Amino acid sequence: MTGNRSLVQRHRKKFVVSSVLFATLFATCAITVYFSKRWLYKQHLKMTEQRFVKEQIKRRFVQTQQDSLYTLYELMPVMTLVLAKDFDLDSIVEALKGKKLQKKLSKGEIAGNELENEGLSSGMSAMTPAPSVSAKSPQSADTTSVSETSTKSKAELWDDLKLKAITKIIILSYTTSLLMLLTRLQLNILARREYLDTAINSAMEKEREKKANQYSVLSWFSSWITEKSNNLPSEKADPRNSDGTIDTDTRSIASTANPEKSRYVNEQAFLSLSWWLLNRGYLQYKSIIEQLVKEEFQNSNPRDIMTMDEFSGKISKIFVTTNKQFFQQPQSNEMFISCLLPEPNLERFVLQQTLEQDALKVLYEDNLLLKQLVQETNKCLQSPGTWIVLESLIDETFHTIMEQIEDNVNSKSKPKSNDDDTKVVDISKNSYQIALFSIATKDCTNEMLKAGLVSMNNKFLQKLHSISALDDLSACVYSNFGL
């Protein structure tokens, strides 16, 4: 026993040192494992957060593009009403049917229920029904149009239908392409600003948390005490003076300072600028297209025969010549932008047409955000990449309408045996009368102006929406890359 005690006493220092070393090693390993796990956990959270942010940005981008399509569907009825003022094709068709009916009555050829099935031609008998209420022009315009068409001869009515149908579909092609481009730019600019603000706020919050974690418990406790003392009611400034009145400047700031409302009004004003294109901007190329259509089709008689390739070639020539006005003239840049956005001195006029008085008051007090958004849009519109996308949209529009017109012509090209006065198909293959092309073009415009927001069945808008170049441009704007 004494020997064991003496052995312990002799090696006491070794035992102490060994115990300390073992404890130190154990503590070091434990701390290392703890911090390693903590670091790995933070890295996992960081990667998960980054992946979540990327997915959120991607989802928001996809949703923004879908919103642009919804916006186009909502604006189609407006476009229908605007174009109906100068291109009311339905009234011309009704007048032609009236002429046909008068001719039948004068010959005494109508009997029984034949009235329902009468048509001016195989194309007219296969026409789509009259448009819905949303697509009709105002009653006063209808009355004027009917009075004008009723005094014209059958040949004049056919000539009007031919020129107006072709002019309308080309104007509609350019207007829809421009509107699709403008809507994509506007919504992606707004979406980018939104997610950048969110990212900045998130980064600032993380930076504050990081700085807070660097302090010791004592400093954190002292800062917490300081924060509590600063949040006491005495800190809140009383706008009242010593006599109980409220200072005028303070009252003005308190009543008008509403950043969220101001931001909302500015964004709505920015989106409402599309009114310019639908009501004023399109007039700049309307006269050009009308003149080109007259040059190509003025001398064509409704009974003249033309192949599908010949008709397509004439339409293509009009598109090419119009594109030169947009893209190859010295003043093309100014013309292009002036079609989409109003001049600065006309912005107030446009906003007065689209916003309510309360919103206008807010906008007059603070329109800085609107100016920034318009400036960004102008910068995007001046980019060569934007012009390339517009050319792609117009090119896709041309191919789409020609495919639709060809389908319409083929579906209406079966002649009726008793309809010798209105036979529109030539004996030679793939040759049709101009009258049939006019009817087919009119029906194509009705298809292009479909506004079924619930059914989303406008194939024309769907094709434009799916153009890859448009998605690439949207991605550049959304991600804040240079164009």
Swiss-Prot record:
Protein origin, superkingdom: Eukaryota
Listed Polar residues bias regions = 242-253
Its placement in the membrane is given as: Single-pass membrane protein
Asked whether the keyword Calcium is assigned, the reply is no
Q: Keywords of this protein's UniProt record, alphabetized? A: Membrane, Peroxisome, Peroxisome biogenesis, Transmembrane, Transmembrane helix
Indicate whether Transmembrane appears among the record's keywords.
yes
Residue ranges in the Peroxisomal topological domain are 1-14
Query: Which intervals of the chain are annotated as region Disordered?
Result: 119-149, 230-253
Transmembrane spans: 15-35
Give residue ranges on the Cytoplasmic side.
36-483
**Database matches in InterPro entries:** Peroxin-3
Q: Where in the cell is it found?
A: Peroxisome membrane
Gene Ontology annotations for the cellular component aspect, listed alphabetically = peroxisomal membrane
User: Which Gene Ontology molecular function entries are recorded, alphabetically?
Assistant: protein-macromolecule adaptor activity
For this chain's UniProt record, which GO biological process terms are given? protein import into peroxisome membrane
Q: Which family does it belong to?
A: Belongs to the peroxin-3 family.
Query: What does this chain do?
Result: Involved in peroxisome biosynthesis.
Recorded protein name is: Peroxisomal biogenesis factor 3
Per the UniProt record, the lineage of the source organism begins with: Eukaryota, Fungi, Dikarya, Ascomycota, Saccharomycotina
